[in-house]
Amino acid sequence: MAEDLETMKPSQAPQQPSLPQGSSKTYRSAEHSQALLSGLVALRDSGILFDVVLKVEGKSIEAHRILLAASCDYFRGMFAGGLKEMDQREVQIHGVSYSAMCRIMDFIYTSDLALSVNNVQETLTAACQLQISEVIQFCCDFLVSWVDEENVLELYKLADIFHLNRLTEQLDTFVLKNFITFSQTQMYRQLPLDKVFSLLNSNRLEVASENEVYEGALLYHYTPEQLEKDQVSLLESPKLLEAVRFPLMDLAILQRLHDKLGLCPLKTTVLKALEYHKNESMQPVMQGPNTQLRSEFHCVVGFGGMYSAPYTVLSDQVKYLNPLLGEWRPLTAPHAPRMSNQGIAVLNNFVYLIGGDNNVRGYRAEARCWRYDPRHSRWFQIQSMQQPRADLSVCVLGDFLYAVAGRDYHDELKEVERYDPFTNTWEYVAPLQKQVHAHAAAALDGRMYVACGRRGNTYLKDTFCYDPERDQWASVALSPVRRAWHGMAALQEKIYLIGGSNDDEGFRQDVLEVACYSPKTDQWTLVSPLPAGHGEPGIAVLAKKIFVLGGRSHNQGDRTDYVHVYEAERDYWEDGPRLEDDISGMAACVLTLPRSVLMDTDVWTQEMYMQYMDPVQNLADNASEVMSVSDWEDLDNSGED
């Protein structure tokens, strides 16, 4: 055949296929690495090409030097780092048992590690010395799978000896999750004081109420029997009581504790907690470390709204998006107002619902206002506004709430009221430059931006900026699209206008264009449009994403249950978990909810929790609450309801 090729004429030689210039492609085999490892195992099993002998406890283990050097830093330094072992046929390994070394070698060759209660500690010791991180993690995972209240103390000691921070965190998770039962044991009292103090300070402590934290702090110094018989001296406050968030304890328990205490530092602490309870309207501006909810769960929460069926029924439901399950769940919140299209704002994890539409016997604008505290799942009615308002916007600037414009179904408004939680009063500030309703607002860098809306039958593009220090409004660049009954959100130094409707085509239609405003340049740009219409939506910002909840689609002619989520960094929309009902006028925000609310289900797993926590560690500081303007359609266009 070779001779035939040599005698072939140039015109008869195989031609190079004609391919486009610069054509290339890289292929990767999914099986190659496993086949390579299997080949090395075959060499080991056949005793072929061994070039080093490890001497462990006087016994020999033959191996391939190149594989050991590739497997971990310990052997890489030994065989490729210029040490004398590079040229030695036999190498002594000290401080490791022969049986543990055999298991390590099996792992290096096969990726499999056989662990048991009897061998895990010696395997962990060997893995730590040889610096094989995967084996260390497997050992830690195995130990955690067997942790209980009897052995957790020994495992803490083991983690401390080998500086296993991940194991320590996993043990902390076990204690925090089982704190109520574990704090009743003798093992609890044998933990170091600093460790217990750290656990009691944690937001991950699983307790039903702060009363249990107080009891847990005392149980470190006293037995359950002593607590039951009230054989406790609090003249010298135990250090652990500094971790108790007394303002979050039940008022009745605080009062009893105060009454029985003599003059001591603890009585002063309890008195301050009682003052917090008694100044209910001021609680949002009395916040500090000892009033923070014990939770790391930031959740999108929706309040109220109106269903499609039964006919124009107002909702008093509160729903939250469970981040562990990825689905909407009811939030237990008795005495919630039955309203729609309320202004909503969050101040220090207290949510305010301002005015709105009480459509019980025809449209009626509300002046009443409510506040919800997720710490105790309690509603509190604050002072009513001086004017009833529907189709309004609400923002928080500093410690104040601002209710902007709207209408009362007799007149459109331009007046702006400011709520002071220190005095529980409303006062007028500088009015908007024109009457408007069905607009939207958002706060950014200490200023409030109000955009679009409707005046009479005209849809607007106007955008205004309010400076609270000067109490002045200024016009800024016009929005590129007219709209009303839309949402607005601030994210990453920009403001987004989302959803709503207009009549630019001579009839009511959805606005799908999403506009983005930069205060630095005073310019609007259009970004990726909505996948579907959202009039009167709920809007909330969480983890650098904008959630758009339900609302009304004029193109479809009905209310909706779909949820869309916008990721600004990718300029991309994705579907979110659907609501349980078609609903419009839902007021939405982001709240930190108690762990007990989310953990009160037999569906979630520890794996779900860890998947949630990994990204949350990086995003917790960025979680923000942005008020939505989920506004009703005007009376003239309400016939379809």
UniProtKB/Swiss-Prot annotation:
Matches recorded under PANTHER family: KELCH-LIKE PROTEIN 22, LD33804P
Keyword line: Cell cycle, Cell division, Cytoplasm, Cytoskeleton, Kelch repeat, Lysosome, Mitosis, Nucleus, Repeat, Ubl conjugation pathway
Where does it localize? Cytoplasm, Cytosol; Cytoplasm, Cytoskeleton, Microtubule organizing center, Centrosome; Cytoplasm, Cytoskeleton, Spindle; Nucleus
Pathway, per record: Protein modification; protein ubiquitination
- Write down the CDD domains for this protein, in alphabetical order: BACK_KLHL22 (cd18461), BTB_POZ_KLHL22 (cd18251)
SUPFAM superfamilies, A to Z: Kelch motif, POZ domain
Instruction: State the protein's purpose.
Output: Substrate-specific adapter of a BCR (BTB-CUL3-RBX1) E3 ubiquitin ligase complex. The BCR(KLHL22) ubiquitin ligase complex could mediate the monoubiquitination of PLK1 and regulate its activity in spindle assembly checkpoint (SAC) and chromosome segregation. The BCR(KLHL22) ubiquitin ligase complex may also be responsible for the ubiquitin-dependent proteasomal degradation of DEPDC5 and the activation of the TORC1 pathway.
- Region Disordered: list its residue ranges: 1-25
- Biased region (Low complexity) positions are 10-24
Q: How does it assemble?
A: Component of the BCR(KLHL22) E3 ubiquitin ligase complex, at least composed of cul3, klhl22 and rbx1.
Q: What is this protein called?
A: Kelch-like protein 22
Q: Which residues form the BTB domain?
A: 50-117
One GO cellular component from the entry? cytoplasm
Q: Which residues form the signal peptide?
A: none
What stretches of residues are Kelch repeats?
A: 299-349, 350-399, 400-446, 448-493, 494-544, 545-593
Q: Name a single GO biological process.
A: protein monoubiquitination
Q: Which organism is it from?
A: Xenopus tropicalis (Western clawed frog)
